[in-house]
């Protein structure tokens, strides 16, 4: 938290004195932080040494501002309620794989139009996925999310890709191939910070889109995308759409950190 806030990558609610905020003058108290110099994995080591139950010591991080940080764009009561349900379902299905962090995020189902060079992006995607450009659908969301460029925080567009077979169904992809796809696009298109690949869709427009995020990391300063079985992602997506009737599509975020941040904000 301290490293990323001082570096301008994130604004953490719990980082104060390290960025020049005098809590004694402003609030009348001094913050005592015996673990402030430790990274997350080191805090876990301390917890294990103190014999704190693993249900506490090993649980995944949760942002101080709560689910609002995973609510991209405007925060509304119904939107948060949908995200709570999607989060519960995501954690239920993915906990057995023990990713370092795994959660759901929610985006308003609104496109940024017109968007330049959509055909060019579709062509790159088709080449990497070994299909015709006609089998690729591109969506750029109106809301944006945080990323990292040159060790600094940036806001960038969220790119979503769907590929379909001859029967019109979504093509299953190995995660490693989707990682190759995001590298091919994001290394040249610095206006994007997150690349999403569609897992499932309802077929009719609804207000929201859910993004499943799962990463592997030791220090949370960098992170790799979790290589999860496609069947589990599908099961998660189908249950989300069954329980969340206002969700139109479900995607998997296949962007490592960097260029994305782990959270959407």
Residue ranges of predicted features:
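ATP/NTP-dependent adenylation/nucleotidyl-transfer catalytic domains that generate, transfer
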Residues: 1-265
């Amino acid at each position: 938290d301290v490293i990323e806030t001082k570096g301008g990558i994130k604004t953490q609610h719990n980082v104060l004195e390290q960025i020049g905020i005098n809590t004694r003058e402003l609030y009348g108290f001094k913050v005592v932080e015996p673990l402030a110099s430790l990274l997350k994995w080191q805090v876990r080591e301390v917890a294990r040494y103190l014999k704190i139950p693993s249900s506490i010591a090993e649980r995944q991080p949760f942002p101080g501002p709560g689910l609002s940080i995973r609510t991209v764009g405007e925060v509304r009561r119904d939107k948060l309620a949908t995200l709570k349900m999607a989060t519960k379902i995501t954690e239920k299905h993915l906990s057995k794989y023990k990713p370092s962090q795994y959660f759901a995020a929610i985006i308003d189902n609104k496109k940024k139009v017109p968007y330049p060079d959509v055909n060019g992006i579709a062509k790159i995607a088709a080449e990497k996925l070994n299909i015709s450009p006609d089998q690729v659908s591109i969506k750029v969301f109106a809301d944006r999310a945080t990323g990292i460029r040159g060790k600094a925080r940036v806001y960038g567009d969220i790119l979503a890709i769907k590929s379909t077979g001859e029967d019109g169904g979504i093509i299953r992809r190995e995660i490693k191939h989707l990682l190759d796809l995001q590298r091919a696009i994001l290394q040249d298109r610095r206006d994007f910070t997150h690349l999403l690949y569609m897992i499932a869709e309802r077929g009719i427009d609804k207000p929201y889109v859910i993004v499943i995020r799962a990463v592997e990391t030791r220090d949370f300063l960098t992170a790799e995308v979790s290589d999860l079985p496609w069947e589990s992602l599908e099961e998660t997506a189908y249950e989300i759409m069954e329980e969340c009737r206002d969700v139109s599509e479900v995607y998997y975020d296949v962007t490592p950190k960097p260029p994305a941040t782990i959270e959407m904000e």
